[in-house]
Amino acid sequence: IDHLASGPRHLFSGWPVAAVPEVAAGLYSIWKGDQFVYIGMSGRSASSEELERRRQIGKTFGLFNRLAAHASGRRSGDQFCVYVADIFVLPQLTSAQIKAISQRQITLDSLVKKYIHDHLSFRFMETSDGATALRIEAEIKDGSLGIKPLLNPTP
């Protein structure tokens, strides 16, 4: 799991990132500079057999789709993007931006996407199945990397 703290960083501004497998269960850590912001996983219910079946189909699944959703900045159905909006974007909004959002001249989601692309990067690791990813995610939320994520630590 040290790879999630010290492995190669990938910028959200470079999405899609070729290194991310198109079909995989696994984990990802999100960083703002050297600050550990978030830990996430994808492929929760996927067995190794299910992952292989999906590879044969050739349709993206798991890590790729989850990171793509985060890169989009859309808050609907994406808790990470909600956290980014609440903790990083909303406190920085000017009165002019708030007015523009209320008049539908700009969207909050577009500002969330801009923030993610301008400030955040990620690391990832593939796991053999979703159950393994879920277990490791819980350990990391508890501090197994020596630090807890800012946005989603275990309370």
Regions found by a protein language model. Give the residues of each.
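Short, conserved catalytic or adaptor-binding loops enriched in Gly and charged residues
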Residues: 111-118
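Short, aromatic/basic-rich helix-turn unit that serves as a nucleic-acid recognition element
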Residues: 122
